[in-house]
UniProtKB/Swiss-Prot annotation:
UniProt KW Mitochondrion keyword: no
Gene3D superfamilies according to UniProt: AP2/ERF domain
Organism listed in the record: Arabidopsis thaliana
Family: Belongs to the AP2/ERF transcription factor family. ERF subfamily.
The UniProt record lists the keyword Transcription: yes
Cell compartments where the protein resides: Nucleus
Listed Basic and acidic residues bias regions: 1-13
Protein name: Ethylene-responsive transcription factor ERF018
Any one biological process term the GO annotation gives: defense response to insect
Gene name in the database record: ERF018
Main localization (coarse): nucleus
Ranges annotated as DNA-binding: 20-77
């Protein structure tokens, strides 16, 4: 009875760790990873590790598109990747395209929230790369609050009065060198490089 309960518990844990997306699985420490098999081969292409299963699934979709074309079965059939592929891509190029497409997921979610539409994203792999790179997104900052500051706000608004400090024009007197009657202040036996 106890063994059966333990087996059921393990089975539930394993199904919870499984993803509902193709090519995606969850690591024990919580990261979602994605990889894809090459057609007619046992070799796999590692597509990366992601924070969410959706990003990992989008990476799989991009690799699926690069390897099998637009008629492949995607995790997100309503939002297939739009990657321009003029020639067959190398595994590092597929990794790069998959990473770029996966990381555009946040932009799509933001676009859905703002407009209710899913914007199409076109990705063009440039030159061959030896490693997958992650696309960076630019953030627009709103600096309109600077208009509220007074015009003379800045370094020129600080006074030049440093009354708490000396002006630096009075230096401490240099102490005179005293004669110690032939005694040297430096012990010559301590010199490291005595050749």
């Amino acid at each position: 009875m106890v063994k059966q309960a333990m087996k059921e518990e393990e089975k539930k844990r394993n199904t919870a760790m499984q993803s509902k997306y193709k090519g995606v699985r969850k690591r024990k420490w919580g990261k979602w990873v994605s990889e894809i098999r090459l057609p007619h081969s046992r070799e796999r292409i590692w597509l990366g590790s992601y924070d969410t299963p959706e990003k990992a699934a989008r990476a799989f979709d991009a690799a699926q598109f690069c390897l099998r074309g637009g008629d492949a079965n995607f995790n997100f059939p309503n939002n297939p990747p739009s990657i321009s592929v003029e020639k067959s891509l190398t595994p590092p190029e597929i990794q790069e395209a998959a990473a770029r497409f996966a990381n555009t997921f946040q932009d799509i979610v933001k676009g859905e929230e703002e407009s209710g539409l899913v914007p199409g994203s076109e990705i063009r792999p440039e030159s061959p790369s030896t490693s997958a790179s992650v696309a960076t997104s630019t953030v627009d900052y709103d600096f309109s609050f600077l208009d509220l500051l007074p015009m003379n706000f800045g370094f020129d608004s600080f006074s030049d009065d440093f009354s708490g400090f000396s002006g630096g024009d009075r230096f401490t007197e240099i102490l005179p060198i005293e004669d110690y009657g032939g005694e040297s202040l430096l012990d010559e036996s301590l010199i490291l490089w005595d050749f």
